[in-house]
Amino acid sequence: MIGSVLQKVVAGQILDIDEAMEAMSAIMTGEATPAQIAALVTALRMRGERETEIAGFVKGLRAHMIPVELQLAQPVIDVVGTGGDGNRTFNISTATAFVVAGAGVPVAKHGNRAMSSRAGSADVLEALGVRIDLNPSAVARCVEEAGIGFMFAQRFHPALRHAAPVRRELGFRTVFNVLGPLANPARVRYQLLGVAMPELVETVARVLALLDVEHALVVHSADGLDEISLGAPTTVYEVRRNGTVEVRRWTLEPESLGLERVPSDALRGGTAEENARIVRAVLEGARGPARDVVLLNAAAALVAADAAQSLAEGLELARHAIDSGAALDRLERLKVLSNALAEAEVPS
């Protein structure tokens, strides 16, 4: 199967969803050789990945992931970025996740170790005292009881090990860089998703439209962040399902919400421990650019989760989540519960 897919891609043809799904299954089961994997992702990168291809790869990846089953009736959201923007900001999406949870929206955060910064979400959560090595049942309990849970990508996508050596050796961005945020093990249907590669922002939005998303905001800022930025306008592709799926493009300016524009250098992070201190300071109410960028991203996430009707309303909900102590409380709850569950070794 992988051989026929390769022939088609090399000939310049576009894979449909089923073909891409079968190709990913061949990779996930170890059927595809390293040479075939490298040839496929390189050819796709040179030609440019299409939405049907990425959607099929996501479906193939989901079929081999370890799922997290949530027993919640309300919307559950993920706040995540592709990484790889090279700006080395602190972990904005991680801080944002606690604010969103503090505003009453459950968060099932999917993440990994460092990519574009010196510390990924997994590294920073560890530095904050959260256990990241939880099994599916334990993660579900965290989301349901603490309002937020974390799924460590390496644990929930073990089949990706077949592609890992190729990714390391190639050393350039491939389709795998965008798959993780699209393959949340809890199958969330609401997302704030940052994309580092400007050429893929609209494509990723249209991938979500082909999948089972209900409401998502896909973002990329003009200063290169895979977040909503304080330093430049942010392009937003909004995907909403209401009978039919609509994809709408708009631009977000921080000034429109009364936030001061500051360069992304003001959001620079450091080690996992340094970033953890920044995240905790934001949750404790410290003022400044770090707080403002988290408020801005949390406002967008609350809109994506249908918890706010506008960014202005989302901003007020986010402010209240921090200033009331609710966001910090979610961190403390997750810290206590994740450690207790890890020690108890809740069965999968």
From Swiss-Prot:
Obligatory cofactor(s): Mg(2+)
Residues reported in the UniProt entry to bind anthranilate 1: 81, 112
Co-factor binding details: Binds 2 magnesium ions per monomer.
InterPro entries: Anthranilate_Pribosyl_Tfrase (IPR005940), Glycosyl_Trfase_fam3 (IPR000312), Glycosyl_Trfase_fam3_N_dom (IPR017459), Glycosyl_Trfase_fam3_N_dom_sf (IPR036320), Nuc_phospho_transferase (IPR035902)
Positions contributing to anthranilate 2 binding: 167
Gene3D superfamilies, sorted: Nucleoside phosphorylase/phosphoribosyltransferase catalytic domain (3.40.1030.10), Transferase, Pyrimidine Nucleoside Phosphorylase, Chain C (1.20.970.10)
UniProt protein name: Anthranilate phosphoribosyltransferase
Species per Swiss-Prot/TrEMBL record: Thermomicrobium roseum (strain ATCC 27502 / DSM 5159 / P-2)
Phylogenetic lineage: Bacteria, Pseudomonadati, Thermomicrobiota, Thermomicrobia, Thermomicrobiales
